[in-house]
Amino acid sequence: MTKNEIIERCRWARDHNESHPSRQWPMGEQLAVALVLRDRSWLDSTNHTTETATDMVCERAGLSAFEFTGWLNDIRAALETEQR
């Protein structure tokens, strides 16, 4: 699960699914997109907290908690740049 893969998933969610992840994607990707797009209602619907989702994404992406913050911010910055 790379930054570019999650950026593409976020674009799709934003453009085609009211900014929600697709339930057809692997769970790690769903959680990553929900975290990037700040989709708390989606996390709630899957019985995940921000903390449990972060833990799972870190595990799947091979990131430490410290690295995750930068990873998340990089993805958000890339998406924000596109919308300007």
Language-model features and meaning:
Residues 1-23:
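Short terminal alpha-helical segments
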Residues 2, 15, 32, 60-61:
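Alpha-helical interaction segments
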Residues 3, 28-33, 50, 68:
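Short runs of predominantly hydrophobic/aromatic residues within well-ordered alpha helices
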Residues 5, 18, 35-36, 64:
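Intrinsically disordered, low-complexity regions enriched in Ser/Pro/Gly/Gln/His and often acidic
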Residues 5-10, 34, 56, 72:
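General helical secondary-structure elements
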Residues 19-24, 45-84:
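Polybasic, proline/glycine-rich intrinsically disordered low-complexity segments
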Residues 30-42:
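Short, hydrophobic/amphipathic alpha-helical patches that form generic packing surfaces
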